[in-house]
Amino acid sequence: MLNQHKVFSAGVHGERLVHVLSGRYLATLATRNGDGSIHQAVVWFLESDGAILIATSAATRKAQNAARDPAASVLIDTRGSGELRGVAASGSIEIVRGDEARALNETVWSKYLTDQGLEDPEVGGAIRANDDITLHFCPDLPWRTWGTDSDFGGAFGRPGTSYALDA
């Protein structure tokens, strides 16, 4: 899992990075379309030894974009009542295929799906039939972090200072 020495320096930013990268959150992956515009996709992810793994289908736009141009960025944030933490990095994507991709994808799915979900033919079966590659995002270090828990002295995270985000 998280290779802390590889990804960050100690302190509040490191703690935030560990919290967000090891949590069960959604990530936004940005890749570049052929015309130069940006394509964003919300994805499940798994941090592995400083990289971000994303299970997907080779037929998706994000996969086709990564095959043509490996430059990408990832944004992961938490959104709770009175709390916002996030991390972001730019980097590049390597596409993993075959048996290695199938094994990596199982680890990504198991972060988000229960054993029951993985065994259900309409859930686990469907996702296995669809996701045939893994996007291996290698961030350019360092990650950027932010959070209402500590930025600006934590003032934005104090009760009564801001409205709660809609669920």
Q: Which residue stretches match the model-derived regions?
A:
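Short secondary-structure boundary/capping segments
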Residues: 18-19, 44, 64, 125-127
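A short beta-turn/loop motif at secondary-structure boundaries
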Residues: 35-37, 80-82, 125-129
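Amphipathic alpha-helical interface surfaces
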Residues: 17, 41, 62-65, 100, ...
